[in-house]
């Protein structure tokens, strides 16, 4: 690759589009005549305010976000949102969660600190290898919301059809599939995503929340930073935001618009994921970990069935110029994360490597 860069299959932080990195490089020392790097700017300056405004406007255009939704840029990444969602949305103290893998499990554990949590569906019975049927969930009338992790980064499943929430608010963690395909924002009351997988550097989450869900009647002990209203009322600048992440994400939003938006991005993602899945389906050594109908376009876990052989694949992949193919420590095996910025050439090169490895280990 250009600049001696590697095909980085990390689950996050992950690859960013090369044209975006080049533009950031060119603006590093003197952003548009300001005499300083964006990292050095006051978040109260007119120059940075324009950066933040453009980032929000471009994201709204990219996702066709309705006017009655607020876009918030909040520090703390994804894990903070496990708590913020529950603290802000549990008005009746009751919520429903669908358990589909490691990250929805973490969200459930955190939400239990703030109210009653009902797991209305789970795929734990088959090691989270599928998305459960959620067409007729048993949802209590007084449940405040239904929560899903729309793409499980570790387990490699994704929702291709959203659950029937029977009129209840849907909350979706889109972290590892954010901006990878079109979505109807109004299907959810709140969408959030840690940005370090598909759109920027670590340390920030994007929250898209319907205005009627922004409450002022929270528990008085709720930290002011943990209130969505604090961020909504101050246009994400109650305190110094993650200026660098906002700037970098804004660049990615513009890049996605320039290539044809999320429809084009989805086409590219389908094409490169299919390259890998086609190989796995025909391989006698490597096996995918997810049922075909629920496979993620972003995170592809697979195994040989032999831990020592899995480790040998990881070692050989590094020698071949690939990075981060080792599966998550909680599940082992192998995983290729092919986020938006991964070119199809990366998927093709990976399959070529795996094909050679299989031939050498018959």
Language model: regions and residue ranges:
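PLP-dependent enzyme catalytic core of the Aspartate aminotransferase-like
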Residues: 1, 6, 319, 332-362
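Active-site C-terminal subdomain of aminotransferase-like
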Residues: 195-277, 291, 360-362
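PLP-dependent aminotransferase-like
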Residues: 79-146
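Active-site phosphate-binding strand-loop segment of PLP-dependent enzymes
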Residues: 12, 111, 123-178
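A glycine-/small-polar-enriched, mobile loop at the entrance of the PLP active site in fold-type I
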Residues: 5-56
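Conserved PLP-binding catalytic core of the aspartate aminotransferase-like
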Residues: 286-317
């Amino acid at each position: 690759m250009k600049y001696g860069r590697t095909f980085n299959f990390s689950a996050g932080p992950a690859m960013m589009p090369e044209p975006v990195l080049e533009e950031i490089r060119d603006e590093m020392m003197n952003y548009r005549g300001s005499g300083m790097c964006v990292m050095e700017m006051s978040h109260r300056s007119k120059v940075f305010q324009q950066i933040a405004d453009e980032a929000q406007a471009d994201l709204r255009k990219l996702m066709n976000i309705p006017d009655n939704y607020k876009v918030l840029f909040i520090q703390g990444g994804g894990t903070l949102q496990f708590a913020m969602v529950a603290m802000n949305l549990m008005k009746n103290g009751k919520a429903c969660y669908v358990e589909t893998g490691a990250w929805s499990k973490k969200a459930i554990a955190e939400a239990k600190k703030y109210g009653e949590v009902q797991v209305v569906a789970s795929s734990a019975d088959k090691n989270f290898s599928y998305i459960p049927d959620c067409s007729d969930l048993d949802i209590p009338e007084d449940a405040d919301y239904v929560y899903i992790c729309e793409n499980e980064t570790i387990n490699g499943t994704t929702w291709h059809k959203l659950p029937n929430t029977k009129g209840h608010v849907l909350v979706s963690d889109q972290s590892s599939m954010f901006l990878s395909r079109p979505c109807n924002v109004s299907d959810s009351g709140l969408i959030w995503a840690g940005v370090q997988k598909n759109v920027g550097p670590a340390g920030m989450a994007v929250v898209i929340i319907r205005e009627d869900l922004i409450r002022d009647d929270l528990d008085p002990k709720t930290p002011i930073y943990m209130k969505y209203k604090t961020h909504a009322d101050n246009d994400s600048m109650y305190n110094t935001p993650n200026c660098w992440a906002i700037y970098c994400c804004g660049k990615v939003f513009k890049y996605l618009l320039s290539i044809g938006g999320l429809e084009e991005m989805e086409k590219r993602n389908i094409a490169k994921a299919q390259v890998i899945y086609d190989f796995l389906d025909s391989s006698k050594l490597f096996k995918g970990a997810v049922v075909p109908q629920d496979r993620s376009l972003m995170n592809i876990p697979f195994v040989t069935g032999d831990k020592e052989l899995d480790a040998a694949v990881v070692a050989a992949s590094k020698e071949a110029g690939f990075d981060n193919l080792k599966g998550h420590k909680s599940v082992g095996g192998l995983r290729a994360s092919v986020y938006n910025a991964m070119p199809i050439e990366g998927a093709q090169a990976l399959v070529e490597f795996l094909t050679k490895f299989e031939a050498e280990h018959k």
